[in-house]
Amino acid sequence: MKRECHLQWYNYIPVIILYSAVIAITFGSLFSLFTNTEMYFIIRLFLFIIYIISLGFTLHYHYKCMTISNIIDYGDDNTLIVTEEKDKNFCKICKVNRPKRSHHCKVCGVCNLRMDHHCPWIANCIGEKNEREFIYFLLFCAITCFFVCCLNFNNFFAFLKNRGLLQEINYRDFIKAMTICSFIISLVVGLTTILIGAHYLLYNVKYNITSIEMFIYKNFSECPDYENDLKNNLLRKIRPFPFSFIENYFREADNINEELNYKNFSEENIKLLNEENNMIKL
C-alpha cells in the first residue's frame, strides 16, 4: 500500500524563501556583471558563467532531494502490518514493524528508511534514497555561494569605502545595493552550508550513523559497531558520481584493487597448500 507524507502549506515556506533568495542573488550577480568596473569584464563573465553552471547543479540536486521519497510502504520488504507492539522497531503511529535504523518523522507523518533528519529547506526527509543527492546539494551550494562572493566582492568593499552610497537614491545605487545584498546573502548561506556539510561529512559519514542516532547515542563509543572508515563510507554514499569520467576512473581503480586482492588471495592459498603438502610428506 502506497503511503504519502502529510505536509501542510506552511511547510513549504522555507523552500519559497530559498528560491526567492536565489532569484535575488541571480539578479544581483547579473547587475554586478555589467556595473563592476573595478574588475575586468572577462573575469566577471567567467565567474558569472561558473555561477550559473553551479547553480544549475544546485537546483537539480535540490529538486532530487525534494522528490525522492524514503517513505516505508506497507509492501516493503521486512515491513509488516501489526496491531500490537512487538519490538523496538514497531511504530505505534503507522502500526508497522519498520526495517532497522528507520524512524518516524513527525513533520511528514510517516516512517522513513534510514532517516537522518527532516530538512525544512527541501520540505522532505533525508534518508537512505536521497542521501547522495543531499551531499551533492550541499557541495554545489557552497561552490555557488563562493563564486557569487567573488563576483560581488569589489562592490561590497566599495560600499564600505564610500559610506554615502545610498544617500541619493537612484537606479545605480539600487543596482549596487542589490549586488551588496547578493554578497552578504551568499556569504552567510555559503558559510552555513560549509559548516553543516563539514559536520555531516566528518561525523555522520565517518561513523556511518544518522543525525538521529547521533542524538540517541550521546558519545560515539555507545554507537553500534558500523564501519568507521571515512573514505569507504563517503565513496559509498556519493557514488555514482555526477560526471561519467570520474565514475569511470574509480571503476577502473576498483577493478585493479579487485584483481590485486584476488591475486594476493591466490598467492596466500598457494603458500598454505604448499605448507600443508610439506607437512603431509613429513
Protein language model regions, located:
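Membrane-associated feature with strongest affinity for ZDHHC
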Residues: 1-282
